[in-house]
């Protein structure tokens, strides 16, 4: 999928719209992570993915052939630069929010794993037949951890 533009002005205008929409979606995702509601970010994933792919594709086309946009009006090109700067800022914000959520999630997983391990390692006694003290029964449960969240 590519932008079908009639001229440089049209292409730049469409790039502005694309960049602004992508910025808006990513900002909404960042807010969801910042407010500890990552499940709310899920509703934007599909559209964000499609638009990000289009953005990447169009950025590569423009880098490969600057002539696609260089004859556009200065005002439009400046607006595109401002939209791109805003997009970069929102990407940085989202990156920080996602990293913070990842750290919290990993911390919770490690805390739970440590608690499970300490519960299993704690000496416990049970009473068997005739009131005799038995060692802690062995449970077959296992837990697996890796470094990916």
Swiss-Prot record:
It is found in: Bacterial flagellum basal body. The gene is flbY. It comes from the Bacteria. The basal body constitutes a major portion of the flagellar organelle and consists of five rings (E,L,P,S, and M) mounted on a central rod. Keywords: Bacterial flagellum. This is Flagellar basal-body protein FlbY. One of its GO terms (cellular component) is bacterial-type flagellum basal body.
């Amino acid at each position: 999928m590519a932008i079908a533009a009639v001229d440089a002005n049209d292409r730049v205008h469409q790039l502005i719209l694309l960049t602004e929409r992508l910025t808006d979606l990513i900002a909404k995702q960042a807010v969801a992570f910042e407010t500890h509601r990552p499940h709310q970010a899920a509703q934007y994933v599909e559209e964000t993915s499609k638009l990000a792919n289009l953005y990447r594709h169009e950025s590569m086309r423009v880098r490969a052939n600057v002539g696609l946009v260089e004859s556009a009006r200065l005002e439009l090109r400046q607006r595109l630069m401002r939209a791109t700067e805003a997009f970069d800022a929102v990407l940085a914000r989202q990156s920080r929010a996602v990293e913070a959520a990842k750290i919290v999630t990993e911390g919770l997983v490690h805390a739970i794993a440590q608690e499970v391990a300490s519960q299993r390692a704690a000496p416990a006694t049970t009473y068997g037949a005739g009131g005799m003290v038995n060692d802690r029964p062995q449970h077959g449960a296992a837990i697996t951890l890796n470094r990916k969240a």
